[in-house]
């Protein structure tokens, strides 16, 4: 009599799609939780352990996924810079460089700055406050500032190459004007302190950058 052989069970199918969905969902929860705690308690007082406990994950998971607290802020800043629309703000900004009309470019950049400032500037201001005593925050703040300055340099170069800059305005001067007027500090002064609306802020940025960068007589539509 032949020995009985237990039937071989087929391997369980592993739903990798569901796993990715759950991981992405947890990723979103973690980032929302971190943003809430940073806004509520500040950068220094918010700990990885606090974010982990509120998000329902382990601190080890946060360190593995983001590298720590500064990594959370870096990812939050990256997302904030995408803006409100389905197309990331930086992509829309790059596309504006191809416009033949300098006024359209400046107006578009002014609108984009007003769009992303309420999302990213509070994070920058948190880092600025923490950077005085926190080397990690200072390092991240400097990293983000350098990246923004490079981007403004690229924008200024695009204006110059297209012949849009007013005579006598150098690429470096244009870069610094763009860098200043799209800064978190400008957002803090006018929207946070003076309670300007986003629309008013956008109009101000557009009018001011037009007056400083474009040929005299250029006006926004």
Give the ranges of each region predicted by the language model:
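Hydrophobic alpha-helical connector segments
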Residues: 69-71, 75, 86-118, 175
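Hydrophobic/aromatic residues within well-ordered alpha-helical segments
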Residues: 26, 69, 80, 109, ...
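N-terminal intrinsically disordered/low-complexity leader segments
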Residues: 1-25, 217-221
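Hydrophobic/aromatic-rich alpha-helical bundle segments in the mid-to-C-terminal region
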Residues: 160-208, 216-221
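Amphipathic alpha-helical packing segments from all-alpha helical-bundle domains
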Residues: 114-128, 136-162, 172-176, 203, ...
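Helix-turn-helix
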Residues: 29, 33, 37-71, 75
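Short, basic, alpha-helical segments at the C-terminal edge of helix-turn-helix-like DNA-binding modules
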Residues: 48, 77-84
């Amino acid at each position: 009599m032949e020995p009985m052989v237990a039937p071989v069970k087929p391997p369980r199918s592993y739903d990798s799609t569901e796993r990715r969905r759950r991981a992405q969902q947890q990723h979103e929860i973690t980032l929302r939780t971190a943003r809430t705690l940073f806004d509520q308690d500040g950068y220094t007082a918010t700990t990885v352990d606090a974010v982990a406990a509120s998000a329902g994950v382990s601190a080890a998971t946060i360190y593995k996924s983001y590298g720590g607290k500064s990594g959370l802020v870096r990812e939050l800043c990256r997302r904030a810079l995408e803006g409100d629309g389905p197309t990331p703000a930086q992509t829309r900004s790059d596309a504006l460089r191809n416009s033949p009309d300098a006024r359209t470019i400046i107006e578009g950049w002014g609108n984009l700055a007003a769009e992303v400032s309420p999302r990213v500037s509070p994070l920058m201001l948190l880092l600025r406050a923490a950077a005085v005593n926190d080397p990690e925050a200072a390092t991240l703040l400097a990293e983000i500032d350098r990246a923004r300055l490079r981007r403004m340099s690229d924008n200024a170069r695009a204006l110059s190459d297209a012949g849009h800059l007013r005579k006598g305005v150098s690429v470096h001067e244009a870069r610094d004007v763009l860098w200043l007027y799209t800064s978190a500090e400008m957002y803090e002064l006018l929207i946070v302190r003076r309670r300007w609306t986003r629309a008013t802020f956008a109009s101000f940025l557009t009018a001011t950058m037009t007056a400083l960068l474009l040929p005299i007589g250029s006006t926004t539509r």
